[in-house]
Structures are given as structure tokens and as C-alpha cells.
Amino acid sequence: MNTVFFYLQVSIKNLHDSIKNLRVSIKNLYVSIKGAGITAFLQTVKYERFEEKILMDFISNLFGRDKNQSFLEASKQGQTENVEKLLRSNKVDVNYQDAYGKTALISAADKGYRDVIGLLIESGPNLDLQDENGNTALISAAKIERGDIIDLLVKNGADLNFQDENGETALKFAVKVGYKNIADQLIDAGTDLNIQDENGETALICAADRAHRDIAELLIKAGADLNIQDNSGKTALVAATKIGHKGIVELLVNAGADLNLQDKNGNTALIYAADRGYRDIVNLLIEGGASLNIPDEAGLTALMFSAQTGRKDIVELLIKAGADINIEDKNNKTAADLAAEVGFEEIVDLLTSVRTYSSS
């Protein structure tokens, strides 16, 4: 038996074993058809009890995939004329996905080929197919900051709220990297502002966490939920407080955010501000009505944190606002005890004098 045909016979018999073997078989299939003719090839594989019709369908599919792959490549390279010719031939699947889940539309969106995208849309593709990473054409357009492509996709019915493998929407990605114009465009188009990613993070929490004040303001004005907590219990307010961003904290306080929500460690925004020495934020939170005496999981209050970190100015601010100096943590220690342990005598004296004055 001809060596090439024998190898081909074995390859086809084991197509199901793996994708690698399938690719080897396809390669040898082309070689055999070209070199020896289809009739001889069919006679060879009939030896293995393949039905001729099934085999012909298989061959047809191979050539079909080849055309679809060429179509995909033309879209990826921005070859407008070739894409148009292939579409007119009616021999390509506009929704064909390669091994990575890429469609012609996603491939064109990845590279920003608007003209190609326009041609593809005229052929009625599924605008919301996702690649192996969960990216849609819309998400891809957002990633390269192409508002014109986003506009084209949205006008033709693309879903704004698909999430990628990390749970991120087009809006979430735009917020993460600070694309204000894209975020604004997606908000105006009606995207869901409160979708949470795999970590429970919303666009607003993300904006606060990354210090994007202008985007946070957009989201707040558009009606984003101020009090959603991520998987760690963090709110947008806590996120902004932890990085010391007074501007975003002020936006959230003025918008009516809940000032007393606790994360999984029991920390409030006020506790974080006191612990990290953000006096202006402590003052903002106090003026906004934050509860002064909420303890964390270890029983520590904002006053205790400021006392043990030596921030006399914040201790004075909290005392003036009415913080309870007599609360004990889970180790039965007061703010004065904690200050004494680390040698902050001025704070100890201040707390002692307040206690003496209060009891007199």
C-alpha cells in the first residue's frame, strides 16, 4: 500500500484521539487529495468501513473551515476588500469561531477596524458571541478606547452587559483603566451600573479604589448604588478612604452613602481614616454623621486606632465629637491603655484628663 495513503488511513482512524491528531490528519488529507486524487483516497478509507457520504461531508467541512479561517484572517488584518468578497460569496459563516473563540467581528474589534466591522454588521452576525476569555466585540472596542466602534455596535443592538471571564463588563474595564469618555458613552447608552465582577467589585468601587474621581462622579450622578459591598465587604466609601482620597469620600458622603457599613474585618470608613491618619477624612465622616464607637472584630474603635498610632490631633477630634473613651477591646484595654503600651504619654494624659473631667 502507498505509504502516504497508509499514513493517512491511520491518521483519520485516530482523529478522535486529540485535536493535535486532527490537525495532522487534516494536513495529510490535503496532501493526499492534491497528489493522488479523491477517488483513490476514498477507496483507501473504505477499507476502514467509512461511509463515502460521511467522508465527503468531512472533506467539505475541511474546505469550509479553510474558507472561514481565511475570512477570519482577512477581518483580523483589516482587509476590507477581501472581507467583502468572501461575504458576497455566501460561502463563509459570519459567526465562525476559531479555536480561541474569536469571530471575524471580535477580531476586527480587537484591532479597531471599523470599516470591516461595518461590513460584517450588514451580514447580520451575532454581535454578542464571546471568545475564550469572555470578550465580546463591545468589550474589545472598550479595551482599545474606540467610542466610534462602540457606537456602531450599540446602535445595532449589541448587549452592553456581557461579562468576560473575570466578570468585567465593557463599563467596568473602561472605569478600571480610566477611560472617562468611554464610561460616559456606555452610561448614556444604558449599561447596568451595578454589575459585580468575580470579586464582587462594581464600577463605582473600582473608580473609588483607583482614584478616578471624575468617573466616580459620573457614576454617582447616573444613579449607581453607593452601598454595594464586594466580597471582602468593601464599599466605594471604604475604598476611597483606604487610599486617602478626600475628593471621592466627599462625593460619596454628600450623595448619601452609608457611613457605617463594615467590611469583613469589622472596619468602617472612620476606623480606616483614623488608623491611617487621614484627619481631613475623619472630619468629613464625623460631620457627615458617622457613628464614632463602632468596634472592629477585635473590639477596637476609631479612637483606639488613633490613640495607638500616636495621632493626638485625631484623638482630640474624636473626643470633641463625643467618642467614648471608656470602651474596652476584647483584651479589656481602653484607648489610654493602648497609647501607654506604645509610649504616647501626651495621648495618655489627654485621655486621663478627659476621664477625670467627665467623672467630676
UniProtKB/Swiss-Prot annotation:
Gene3D superfamilies: Ankyrin repeat-containing domain (1.25.40.20). PROSITE patterns: ANK_REP_REGION, ANK_REPEAT. SMART domains: ANK (SM00248). InterPro entries: Ankyrin_rpt, Ankyrin_rpt-contain_sf. ANK repeats lie at residues 100-129, 133-162, 166-195, 199-228, 232-261, 265-294, 298-327. It comes from the Archaea. GO terms for biological process: RNA processing. GO terms for molecular function: RNA binding; RNA nuclease activity. Keywords: ANK repeat, Repeat. Pfam families: Ank, Ank_2, Ank_5. This is Putative ankyrin repeat protein MM_0045. It comes from Methanosarcina mazei (strain ATCC BAA-159 / DSM 3647 / Goe1 / Go1 / JCM 11833 / OCM 88) (Methanosarcina frisia).
